Amino acid sequence: MKSSDIRQSFLDFFVGKSHAIVRSAPVIPADDPTLLFTNAGMNQFKDVFLAKGTRSYSRAADTQKCIRASGKHNDLEDVGRDTYHHTFFEMLGNWSFGDYYKEEAITWAWELLTVVWKLPEERLYATVYHDDDESFRIWEEKTSIRPDHILRFGDKDNFWEMGETGPCGPCSEIHIDLTPDGSGRALVNADDPQAIELWNLVFIQYDRQVDGRLEPLPQRHVDTGMGFERVCAVMQGKSSNYDTDVFRPLFDTITELTGVEYGASMHDPQDIAMRVIADHARTLSFALSDGAMPSNEGRGYVLRRILRRALRYAKDLGYNKPILHRLVATVADSMGDVFPELRDRQDAVARIVKAEEESFLVTLDRGIEIFNGLVGKVRGEGSSTLEGEDAFKLYDTYGFPFDLTRLMASSAGLQVDGEGFERCMQEQKTRARQDRREKQRGGAEEGSWEWFSDLHATEFTGYDGLEADASIIGISRSKKNLLLVLDRTPFYAESGGQTGDRGWIETGEYRLEVTDTQKDGDSFVHVVTRAFDNVRDSEADPADIAVGPGRVHASVDRKLRQATERNHTATHLLHAVLRHTLGAHVQQKGSLVNPERLRFDFSHFSKLTPEEIDAVESAVNDCIRQAEATLKHADVPYDDAITKGALAFFGDKYADLVRVVEIPGISVELCGGTHVDNVGQIGLFKIVGESSVAAGVRRIEALTGRAAEELMWNEYRELHDVRQLLKMKAEEPPAEKVAAILEERRALEKQLAELKAEVLLVKLQGDASALEDVCGCRIVARVVDGADAEGLRYAAQMLRQQFPLSAGLLCSSAEGKVSLAAFASDRAVKELGIDAGKLIRQAAAAVKGGGGGKAEFATAGGKNPEGMEDACRVFREAVRCIVKA
């Protein structure tokens, strides 16, 4: 029975039992930022079990996409080494929401397995919770299972809980005995591949209290799950999930790419590598098609680890090129009928994966070289443990996830100091945290504050106005600055990428200039860098002035705040446009919003083309021209914000009450920053830069409002000046004429270089001592005065063509920089084995430089002109030795 038929027969069976067939939820949870990946069929029904949601149906069945690659439910380390663990798998399941219960769940499971699929009854075992007599009785009286095949187990194996508190209940599992003689009773629940769990039937009937008590739920539910790959192996008579038709297309593609056949043996390193690559290709295809992106944090880092792990295993197949992106199409072809998103996003997923592979392969070989050196060092010291600091260096410098280093170390017979690695990781985080804290305190030392109130919190009034009367509740001094905390303030403190407000605080005696505002816990720290003494009508040192508790008037610089607000609202427009233009995989990875400009980092797999940049810029300006788009701000419960469509990303921390900024019809985001009232106030949006920040992360820099206008006016004036210089009309595009001038210049420069080379060649030919004949081979090694690097190259090429059996090195210097050009004729390379690339590296050492190239021609540079004669001598002697040998 084919895997596709097995899946369909499961769904058809439950349609016959009046179940609604629901679509698989994405593997990226849409409304649960606490969960990395969907890891069970019940995830999408979690709200029902928690009595926070309902469905229009009371019976459901589906095949759910699942990923288990991190945290408690983590199969990553076992993948490839056994027959049945995967990071991606399908979970077949059926559910009852307050409808049927134990009897139907048990009898229907038995009917499907033994009547429809015709699995041998004598090979099946049922486990029940040790005091669940009801389930035991149903198995005994309502099915034809052998009574001695009903086994009782305790909490560890047969009691399901969602968490430390909440919905829970006993479960009944169905296992199959795969031992040759049917003697697997003792292997049930022993994590043995010869007695595997097929189906878990969970009966949710209790609510676990904080004190551990179990209270009956008002409604009882059924939640079942069956591993699709496992049941396919059983139905197809295979001893391994990987031997089924689920994986065969992937192995065929890997064989086609690498030339390595699958099926040598269970423990063969190349078979293990092929299983890992096949599994990881599925995981990446499904995760990325559901909107995930590789990154350095959260679920994105898990995916990056998986990809890099697979690339490391590809080396065991002798394959050193990107491979996973070639498998994306295979996954889509074999599973796209059931999960159409695989085909819909196939090209985009392949591009993302390929970009990630190419990025890591740049450092992989160097990292492996460093790792091998560390292995030699450890063995030389008589140790068997790789230091945590070394593992951290591989992670920090070469992008080696810790589990990849541990895997490589295990293959080398070594262990890795995990505690030491974690210590280095924590030290790095602590340093970063301390740097952030110092900035938030405005540079003040810990404990240097003088407080005038038991409450240190600041009330922010800056959403509604830019001025406020307030009281000073805290003072500190840092170097030449004065730091103030007020009980209320209109100054926005830096957070969410928006820089802190600037402005003034009036005390009566002093006018204090605030040049930054930082947030330290609940306190807003106003950084004062200049002070004006109103009484003496002169400037004062802010670190020395006498300021104590009292009333003040705080006012934000209106012009700067408005410029910041234009830039901040523009980032929301930009984010929405990027998601619409490039795809839903685009997620904000960072931002900087200040009065001068905006910077927006986002997940994307490739450099934006000029056409894409133009399209994004044009779309943002189209949004701005919709001047009727008035922003809406509201503080709402987090769940309501998510329901409204506001984006929430894994790892972000949100309070129960969140601020939602909505640009109607365009964008809904959780954001605590300040914004314009109407998008028309932004005026103009102009992209000034697009670049790479990290693998899979791009950056756009842009200007808005007056800054964007000034940039465009400056560019217009410069273009006008260029047209005048070229004597062109206003309507004529200057690009073609400039290109023609540059092409003409390049041609003239080439002619000049050739003329210089010919002069140099004549000079060398006229100097009898320049060309040495050794056993018929012409050798030249000379310092040439006044020649530039281009002239040296042309002269070397001419000498190479003029003398059929020859080798030479030409050197010159200008402004302390040395240029070298070496050559070897075709006959010198083939008949004598002369290699200009190797020889120039030896010679370059004399001028404190380096270089290289091919055997026929090579170049180098250096910074020691005094060593040029030595370089010539080294080259000449080396060639003599080769020729005479």
From Swiss-Prot:
CDD domains: AlaRS_core (cd00673). It is found in: Cytoplasm. Residues 426-445 are annotated as: Disordered. GO terms for cellular component: cytoplasm. Residues 426-444 have a biased composition (Basic and acidic residues). The keyword Ligase applies. GO terms for molecular function: alanine-tRNA ligase activity; aminoacyl-tRNA deacylase activity; ATP binding; tRNA binding; zinc ion binding. GO terms for biological process: alanyl-tRNA aminoacylation. Keywords: Aminoacyl-tRNA synthetase, ATP-binding, Cytoplasm, Ligase, Metal-binding, Nucleotide-binding, Protein biosynthesis, RNA-binding, tRNA-binding, Zinc. Its cofactor is Zn(2+). Zn(2+) binds at H568, H572, C671, H675. Its EC number is 6.1.1.7. Binds 1 zinc ion per subunit. InterPro entries: aa-tRNA-synth_II/BPL/LPL, Ala-tRNA-lgiase_IIc, Ala-tRNA-ligase_IIc_anticod-bd, Ala-tRNA-synth_IIc_core, Ala-tRNA-synth_IIc_N, Ala-tRNA_ligase, Ala_tRNA_ligase_euk/bac, DHHA1_dom. Pfam families: DHHA1, tRNA-synt_2c, tRNA_SAD. NCBIfam families: alaS. Consists of three domains; the N-terminal catalytic domain, the editing domain and the C-terminal C-Ala domain. The editing domain removes incorrectly charged amino acids, while the C-Ala domain, along with tRNA(Ala), serves as a bridge to cooperatively bring together the editing and aminoacylation centers thus stimulating deacylation of misacylated tRNAs. HAMAP family: Ala_tRNA_synth_B. This is Alanine--tRNA ligase. It comes from Chlorobium phaeovibrioides (strain DSM 265 / 1930) (Prosthecochloris vibrioformis (strain DSM 265)).
